[in-house]
Amino acid sequence: TPDWAADTLPCIPSAYSGASPVLKLTRGKDGKTTPAELWFHRRLRVHHGNAVRIGDHVYGSSGDFGPSFVAAADVKTGQILWQDRSFSKANFILADGRLIILDEDGNLALATAGPSGLKVISKAAVLEKTAWTAPTLVGTKLFIRDRRSIMALDLG
């Protein structure tokens, strides 16, 4: 899922033999939009579908087939700001300025992220392994699932 912002710099999360490029979109006088790759970094291979953009930084779970980690990159330069190995491959959603993280091992966490690092507020094992689906937040209800079950948690 691409991450968009008003500065026309979408991040396109991908893995395997690729990486997660950031594109620069330019509108010509003819009204046509032209994409150009701004940067491409092999250390940001977002394996599970999504990344989150907060300001000028993009946060994603990299790992492809190797060791996994949460990483932060400067969206304008591609510089990797930090890596955190406390999660297996994970999906994220942004809620009220905080990240809700669900990793593939079933660990659910609430965290804050910034250019200097990831701060985990709380973390708990709530599902079995193979939790690949991104969490969904509807109001105060958080829906999460692994390959065998689905769970609704009231965060209100």
Mark where each language-model region is:
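Noncatalytic, solvent-exposed loop/strand surfaces
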Residues: 1-156
